[in-house]
């Protein structure tokens, strides 16, 4: 069938796709969702280019590729698609390119954003549409993130409009990246759109409806790649 390469969001890991993996594997896809690693010089020295190089290394040659990215991973996936055009691209509550995002003061990030070992209440608030089992499972898995990477991605970070079939998946109750931003991204990318009412930022991947979202996304991929 082909290969799915899924890129996680800031502070997360490949584990974020744990509920999506079996849906695509049962349909015959190889599903790759690795953890992005800090550079050898440490997390504070890690740049977007380090992550992009890693994603490139995950992609097998001569395979039909579906590229998926969530949040930070969405913008990284858009950039990867410039050099290694996939057969299809899926952007989940994605950070937008700088020329698509609404104008706002540039936020300054610390060298390391500390999310590891955060309070359980923060995970419960973020995953309000997940069941308690998933909340307890996700809570110890959050990690610290490179502030420099997010600084780059929130600054001037130009990307080309994707040339392949593209799907934008949005949670209507995303409190990190408002869904209206995703609507602008979908318009810019000339993408199809799946908007889920009442769903959180991480909800497409980890909410009670995550398997449903995965199946609907799989059906879209299969229909667009006929």
Question: Could you tell me what each predicted segment is?
Answer:
Residues 36-65:
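Active-site loop/oxyanion-hole signature of alpha/beta-hydrolase fold enzymes
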Residues 82-116, 149-156:
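Flexible "cap/lid" loop of the alpha/beta hydrolase fold
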Residues 175-181:
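Conserved alpha/beta-hydrolase "acid-adjacent" motif
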């Amino acid at each position: 069938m082909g290969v799915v390469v899924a890129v996680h969001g800031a502070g997360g890991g490949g584990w974020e796709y744990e509920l999506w993996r079996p849906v695509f594997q049962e349909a015959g896809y190889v599903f790759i969702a690795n953890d992005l690693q800090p550079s050898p010089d440490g997390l504070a020295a890690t740049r977007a280019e380090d992550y992009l190089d890693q994603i490139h290394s995950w992609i097998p040659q001569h395979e039909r590729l579906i590229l998926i990215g969530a949040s930070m991973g969405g913008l990284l996936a858009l950039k990867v698609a410039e050099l290694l055009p996939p057969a299809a691209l899926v952007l989940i509550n994605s950070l937008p390119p700088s020329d698509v995002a609404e104008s706002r003061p540039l936020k300054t990030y610390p060298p390391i954003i500390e999310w590891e070992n955060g309070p359980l209440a923060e995970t419960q608030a973020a995953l309000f549409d997940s069941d308690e089992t998933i909340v307890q499972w996700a809570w110890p898995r959050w990690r610290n993130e490179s502030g420099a990477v997010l600084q780059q991605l929130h600054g001037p970070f130009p990307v080309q409009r994707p040339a392949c079939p593209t799907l934008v998946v949005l949670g209507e109750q995303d409190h990190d990246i408002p869904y209206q931003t995703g609507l602008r991204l979908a318009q810019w990318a000339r993408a199809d759109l799946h908007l889920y009412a009442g769903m959180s930022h991480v909800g497409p991947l980890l909410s009670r409806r995550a398997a449903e979202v995965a199946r609907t996304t799989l059906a879209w991929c299969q229909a667009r790649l006929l």
